[in-house]
């Protein structure tokens, strides 16, 4: 069964004596250059004249008019071709599709790509998709930064109590360390408390004069030894 546009869309039969040169208005508005036109067998009426004039009109206007995607016509084969090509490109670049789904620009991702694996840099928000307020901060990092200075002070105090030479701690005075060590020794006395008290008094006297003595431990360890 042949199919064609209804005759009501045409103002009248197309003249056959134009030599194949149809007007632009007829080729664009009334019929499509690539529209299949089937003429009934044995017909010599207006349908055969239309079939004779459609092909020369498409050739006169060039290949741009003959392409359905150039004119915006929803041709089945053209959209199918575009869909296959788009799906092939998406399978070829899966990370681009992931960035588009997250709403990030491709240029931004390329500029921030070298910073993804840096240990000293915070992880960018491009991969997780969270704002800085929503992103949780690890508690280990906060606790380490907050307790780093007290750990050093406690370690220095323990070394002084054990009689191990210490190095100056930034932000901590030597007088405070000696006072803390004396307070600790008073709170935890030992059998030879008198000897220890005399030793700490001698150390305090040297500190007041501007010299930090090298106090030997009770176990007879040399001044430069470690725990």
From Swiss-Prot:
Alphabetical keyword list: Differentiation, Membrane, Spermatogenesis, Transmembrane, Transmembrane helix
Location of the protein in the cell: Membrane
Keyword S-adenosyl-L-methionine (UniProt): no
A Pfam family: SPATA25
Topology term for the membrane: Single-pass membrane protein
Expression sites (tissue/organ): Expressed predominantly in testis (at protein level). Expression is lower in patients with obstructive azoospermia than in fertile controls and is not detected in patients with non-obstructive azoospermia.
Span list, region Disordered: 1-23, 204-227
GO cellular component, one term: membrane
Record field: transmembrane: 152-172
Keyword Transmembrane (UniProt): yes
Highest taxon above the source species: Eukaryota
Major localisation: membrane
GO biological process: cell differentiation; spermatogenesis
Task of the protein: May play a role in spermatogenesis.
Family label: Belongs to the SPATA25 family.
Protein name per its UniProtKB record: Spermatogenesis-associated protein 25
Species in which this protein is naturally found: Homo sapiens (Human)
GN (gene name): SPATA25
